[in-house]
Structures are given as C-alpha cells and as structure tokens.
Amino acid sequence: RVNVLVRNYRPQDNVIEMLCINFDITQLKETEQMLIKAKEKAEEADRLKSAFLANMSHEIRTPLNAIVGFSSMLEEAEDQEEKHQYITIIEDNNKLLLQLISDILDLSKIEAETFDIIPERVNAKQLCNDLFQAMQMKTSPQVELRLKDNLPELTFTSDKNRLYQVLLNFVTNALKFTSEGNITIDYQIDGNEVKFSVQDTGMGIEPEKQEAIFTRFVKLNSFIPGTGLGLSICQSIVTQLGGKIGVESEPGKGSCFWFTHPIN
C-alpha cells in the first residue's frame, strides 16, 4: 500500500512537493485471509451441524420404529415362522442402530480432532486374512469372497484397528451391492506405499456419483440399509494415516474401492 502526501504545492511556481510512504501489508493480508477462511469454516460447520441433526433424526427414528413396531407384533404372533421373521427384522434394525451410533461417535471424534491413531506393527497378509475369515460366513452362496493369491509379505507401522475398519467397510458395502459373482480382497506394494483394494462384480456406480459417495449421508440406494457415513469416516481415517482413498467403477460391471498407505 502506498500513501501519497502533498507537502508543498505552489502552482504559480510550477512546484509540487510530494511524500510517498510505502507500507508492507503482507501480514495484514495474510491475517485477513485467515479470518475469511475461519468465517467460511464456521459457516460450513454450522451448515453441516444442521444437516447432521436433520439426517440423524430420520436415520435413528427409522430403525427404532421398526424395533418398537415389530416387538409389539411379536407378542401377538402365534405362528413360529412369523415370529422368526419378526425377530430377524428386529435383530437387523438393532445392528443398524448400533452401527449408526458407532458412526456418530467416530464422526464426533473426527470433528473434535480427538480421533486417536494408535500405531503398531501390522502384518498386511494377516490383516487381510483375518477380514477374509470373518466375512466368509456373512457371504451369500451366490457370491464368492476371495483373498488374492500370492500376496507379498509386508509388515509396516499403522493403526491395525483403523485399517481393519476401512477394509471391513469396503467388504460390507461390496456384499450389499453384489448379488452374484465375486469380491476380491487384495493389496500390492507400489514404491514407498501399499495399496489395499476390494473389488466386486456388483451393480457399479455412475461416474457422476463416484466422488459424492465419500460425502456424509450420501447413499446410492435408499432401499439398502446403511448410515451413509461409513465412506466419509473411511476417508478421514485414511487421510490421518497419510494415504489417499478412491474408487474405480463401471455401471453394470462392478467397483474397486482402494486406499493407499505409506510404508515406513
């Protein structure tokens, strides 16, 4: 910024004496930008909070209504098969409600920046095998869950539970959207990072929706149970671990969800 002062002005003598003062306002502009960003962040946080409360009101009420409603009907049911159907519906909605509460707690920790990362030595092959064994029992007969052959030996430092959480979310989503075919758990070493992936032969995702699925409360199919928070939480976890997350998909052919992690 330049301020110009006229010290002596005598037009009859064709004299004008000026004083120019140059001010460095770099720090002022930097502070101004910081304040603008802080304001925008606060406004965005307020918007997300309102959206969060509106969505949670609906998401919590849905399984609760099912639990309360079918619990009442269970008392009146006389047929054993009918009772079994009601119990199954109640159990499914209990699981959905528990998952929703778990996601809310994770999300609140992320917002408060208290989302702890506990580093330990992780065996990549063992991690994927544990997931494979746990999810095999939950896979329908029409779908084959696979663990990629000849996985490379790899041990690195990370938060094992958080890595498992991300991979579990990928496999769970793949099972929801794959009615037949196969789902493959894989990882490959690429330079100084490892790339984990879960590939399925499911319904696939439209190109315009692929970026949005990592946004909170975005659900590809409102008829399939889910909170719409899982992938958003996965993105936050992967970012905190120093990696990247993404998806490659083609409608009608399937999807491949992946994330990278630095090897140290």
Feature annotation, model-predicted:
Residues 2-18:
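Short loop/turn elements at sensory-signaling interfaces that couple input to output
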Residues 21:
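Sensory beta-strand/linker motifs that couple input domains to effectors
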Residues 32-74:
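Primarily the dimerization/phosphotransfer
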Residues 92-98:
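Short alpha-helical segment of the dimerization/phosphotransfer core of two-component systems
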Residues 108-119:
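Helix-loop junction within the histidine kinase core
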Residues 205-217, 257:
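Short conserved segment of the HATPase_c
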Residues 230, 234:
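Short alpha-helical Gxxx[C/S/T] motif in the catalytic ATP-binding
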